[in-house]
Amino acid sequence: MSVLFQLLIAAFVALSFAMIIGVPVVFSTGDASDDANKLIWGGAAAWVVLLFVAALASIVVI
Protein backbone atom coordinates (compact mmCIF):
# COMPACT_ATOMS: atom_id res chain seq x y z
CA MET A 1 0.00 0.00 0.00
CA SER A 2 2.92 2.29 0.68
CA VAL A 3 4.16 1.98 -2.91
CA LEU A 4 0.70 2.85 -4.24
CA PHE A 5 0.64 5.92 -1.99
CA GLN A 6 4.04 7.02 -3.25
CA LEU A 7 2.91 6.59 -6.86
CA LEU A 8 -0.22 8.67 -6.15
CA ILE A 9 1.90 11.46 -4.67
CA ALA A 10 4.32 11.30 -7.62
CA ALA A 11 1.41 11.53 -10.07
CA PHE A 12 -0.03 14.45 -8.09
CA VAL A 13 3.28 16.32 -8.16
CA ALA A 14 3.79 15.62 -11.87
CA LEU A 15 0.28 16.82 -12.72
CA SER A 16 0.79 19.91 -10.57
CA PHE A 17 3.96 20.82 -12.46
CA ALA A 18 2.24 20.17 -15.79
CA MET A 19 -0.64 22.45 -14.81
CA ILE A 20 1.73 25.16 -13.53
CA ILE A 21 3.47 25.22 -16.90
CA GLY A 22 0.56 24.34 -19.18
CA VAL A 23 -2.21 26.67 -18.02
CA PRO A 24 -0.28 29.95 -18.56
CA VAL A 25 0.96 28.68 -21.93
CA VAL A 26 -2.58 27.90 -23.08
CA PHE A 27 -3.87 31.27 -21.89
CA SER A 28 -0.96 33.21 -23.41
CA THR A 29 -1.48 31.75 -26.88
CA GLY A 30 -4.72 33.69 -27.20
CA ASP A 31 -6.49 30.68 -28.65
CA ALA A 32 -9.64 30.28 -26.56
CA SER A 33 -10.80 27.16 -28.34
CA ASP A 34 -13.03 24.58 -26.74
CA ASP A 35 -10.27 21.97 -26.90
CA ALA A 36 -7.95 24.12 -24.81
CA ASN A 37 -10.67 24.83 -22.26
CA LYS A 38 -11.58 21.14 -22.05
CA LEU A 39 -7.93 20.28 -21.51
CA ILE A 40 -7.59 22.80 -18.68
CA TRP A 41 -10.82 21.74 -16.98
CA GLY A 42 -9.94 18.07 -17.42
CA GLY A 43 -6.54 18.64 -15.85
CA ALA A 44 -8.10 20.55 -12.98
CA ALA A 45 -10.62 17.77 -12.39
CA ALA A 46 -7.87 15.14 -12.45
CA TRP A 47 -5.86 17.25 -9.99
CA VAL A 48 -8.79 17.43 -7.55
CA VAL A 49 -9.47 13.70 -7.87
CA LEU A 50 -5.81 12.89 -7.24
CA LEU A 51 -5.84 15.21 -4.24
CA PHE A 52 -8.77 13.43 -2.61
CA VAL A 53 -7.53 9.94 -3.49
CA ALA A 54 -4.09 10.71 -2.05
CA ALA A 55 -5.70 12.16 1.09
CA LEU A 56 -7.81 9.04 1.57
CA ALA A 57 -4.81 6.82 0.89
CA SER A 58 -2.77 8.71 3.48
CA ILE A 59 -5.39 7.87 6.09
CA VAL A 60 -5.09 4.18 5.23
CA VAL A 61 -1.28 4.16 5.07
CA ILE A 62 -0.67 6.04 8.31
UniProtKB/Swiss-Prot annotation:
User: What is the protein's membrane topology class?
Assistant: Multi-pass membrane protein
The Swiss-Prot or TrEMBL record describes its family as follows: Belongs to the PsbZ family.
Q: Which GO terms describe its biological process?
A: photosynthesis; photosystem II stabilization
Q: Which NCBIfam families match?
A: PS_II_psbZ
Report the superkingdom from the record.
Bacteria
SUPFAM superfamilies under this entry?
PsbZ-like
Protein name per UniProt: Photosystem II reaction center protein Z
> Membrane spanning segments where?
8-28, 41-61
The UniProt subunit note reads as follows: PSII is composed of 1 copy each of membrane proteins PsbA, PsbB, PsbC, PsbD, PsbE, PsbF, PsbH, PsbI, PsbJ, PsbK, PsbL, PsbM, PsbT, PsbX, PsbY, PsbZ, Psb30/Ycf12, peripheral proteins PsbO, CyanoQ (PsbQ), PsbU, PsbV and a large number of cofactors. It forms dimeric complexes.
Enumerate the subcellular locations listed in this protein's record, separating them with semicolons.
Cellular thylakoid membrane
Is this entry keyworded Iron? no
List, alphabetically, the Pfam families matched: Ycf9
Q: What does this protein do?
A: May control the interaction of photosystem II (PSII) cores with the light-harvesting antenna, regulates electron flow through the 2 photosystem reaction centers. PSII is a light-driven water plastoquinone oxidoreductase, using light energy to abstract electrons from H(2)O, generating a proton gradient subsequently used for ATP formation.
The reply to whether Transferase figures as a keyword in the UniProt entry is no
Recorded GO cellular component terms are:
photosystem II reaction center; plasma membrane-derived thylakoid membrane
Q: Which UniProt keywords apply?
A: Membrane, Photosynthesis, Photosystem II, Reaction center, Thylakoid, Transmembrane, Transmembrane helix
User: What Gene3D superfamilies does UniProt report for this protein, alphabetically?
Assistant: Photosystem II PsbZ, reaction centre (1.10.287.740)
